[in-house]
Amino acid sequence: MTSSRPSGRDSTGWQETVSNTSPKLVNAMEAARAGAAEVGRVGRRFLYRIWDWEPVNNRTINEPVWCLGCSYTLDIKQYGSPLSSSSLSQLTADTPPLDKSQLAATHQHQDFNGVRTTATATCLSDTSMSAAPTGSQLGSFDTVPDSVTSGYDSALAYEEPGQDGGWPPAFLDDFESRIWMTYRTDFALIPRSSDPQASSALSFAMRIKTTFSDLTGFSSDTGWGCMIRSGQSLLANAILIARLGREWRRGTDLDAEKDIIALFADDPRAPYSLHNFVKYGATACGKYPGEWFGPSATARCIQALADEKQSGLRVYSTGDLPDVYEDSFMAVANPDGRGFQPTLILVCTRLGIDKINQVYEEALISTLQLPQSIGIAGGRPSSSHYFVGVQGQRLFYLDPHHPRPALPYREDPRGYTAEELDTCHTRRLRQLHIGDMDPSMLIGFLIKDEDDWDTWKSSVKHVQGKSIISVSPYDPARGQGGGRAEAIDEVETLESDDDGEPALGA
């Protein structure tokens, strides 16, 4: 198996040399190395904050922008209610071909230049897409700029009328309707581990914090919980779509939205709380409270908690390799053969060593264009985001690195206030070029029925570039048939730290 872990000689040679002189010197050098890595991470974060300008859409090119399988463009020619089948042929040439089962809607809006435009939104139905749209269908990614970056920075982007950055209003409405989980503060204490090794598993910053303070536990996940929050976001949106449908938007069916938000309150009584992620991570994944999670540990927590809490959504995880086995999947989605249950597929993968290998870029982009898409939890090195949209080679994400007061647990979810719900949504776009993504990630897909399953299988197979997901009939672990012999050579291992997985943290 190809491994991203450096060889033992390369990684420990200096320690062996110095340890013959002084063990204390080894510890000091190890601390210095960890400190240097932390300084580099904080420096990158500082630069990202300074130049984290809102992206602006190039209205002249009007390239489609996608959000979890729905495509949006500005269209100055059309306005009105959802298009009839006879109107589908009038869609812009930039939008991939549609059939009569596709749903399109237009929205009139006054953009930031005062020009009245309409936005065309196209959501592909579960049965209308046998293969993911490719880069060639959407225009050349290499020759046309997809979006530009504005010269201002504001956390209140697009909140005022007309300040939409040139993006289709329907796209912003869709983006804002995605559930967004972030750092929280002042929640019920998560006790520190009494294991002597727990401290060494923490990041350098957390070690400093816990060493020089009388910290008996964690009442905030700032600095270590971003991968858990990204995983919560992915799970929350899967539950949202399974219950309310892909067309749900903010402001409709508030009670149903509150029921879902309550599942993720920052309290041990909430089924999918940070507390329960940490609890399961400690018992089953070897993750200490305050330690960064990686994609693999996050996927295992989601699967275990979903199985235990009976949310109406089933979860199938591929483990550390991106191979989906149909017999194992069906054992989760339809175990008794009496009825298919909505099932979330979680694919853990690593698409390179330090950055994503270019041969996988088209296939990765297509995962956000599939109608079954639930997004990607991953991001920059040691910094996880939740990716839900794409335009060209720019991916749009929800950033969990924004501390907010703890989301309270309520016995009656109808008691949540509008202000509390607002903390779980944002209209502020952030983008990252695919070449800047960390190669370790967790990809989610929601399969609603068997037709959806058949469509998804074909879609992940027929992609531009090299496929990042394989679907095989039988799981070798179940004693039937054999796995793909080439899978071991194709996939980079997820192991890159001492715990067997890359940790995406602060």
UniProtKB/Swiss-Prot annotation:
Q: Where is this region: Disordered?
A: 1-21
Subcellular localization: Cytoplasm; Nucleus; Preautophagosomal structure
List the transmembrane segments. none
- Chief location: cytoplasm
Residues annotated as catalytic: C226 (nucleophile), D399, H401
Q: Name one GO molecular function term.
A: cysteine-type endopeptidase activity
A Pfam family that the UniProt record links to this protein: Peptidase_C54
Q: Give the record's GO CC terms.
A: cytoplasm; nucleus; phagophore assembly site
Q: Please explain the role this protein plays, according to its UniProt record.
A: Cysteine protease that plays a key role in cytoplasm to vacuole transport (Cvt) and autophagy by mediating both proteolytic activation and delipidation of ATG8. Required for selective autophagic degradation of the nucleus (nucleophagy) as well as for mitophagy which contributes to regulate mitochondrial quantity and quality by eliminating the mitochondria to a basal level to fulfill cellular energy requirements and preventing excess ROS production. The protease activity is required for proteolytic activation of ATG8: cleaves the C-terminal amino acid of ATG8 to reveal a C-terminal glycine.
Sorted alphabetically, which PANTHER family does this protein's record hold? CYSTEINE PROTEASE (PTHR22624:SF49), CYSTEINE PROTEASE ATG4 (PTHR22624)
Q: Which family does it belong to?
A: Belongs to the peptidase C54 family.
Which protein, by its recorded name, is this?
Cysteine protease 1
Q: What organism is recorded for this protein?
A: Neurospora crassa (strain ATCC 24698 / 74-OR23-1A / CBS 708.71 / DSM 1257 / FGSC 987)
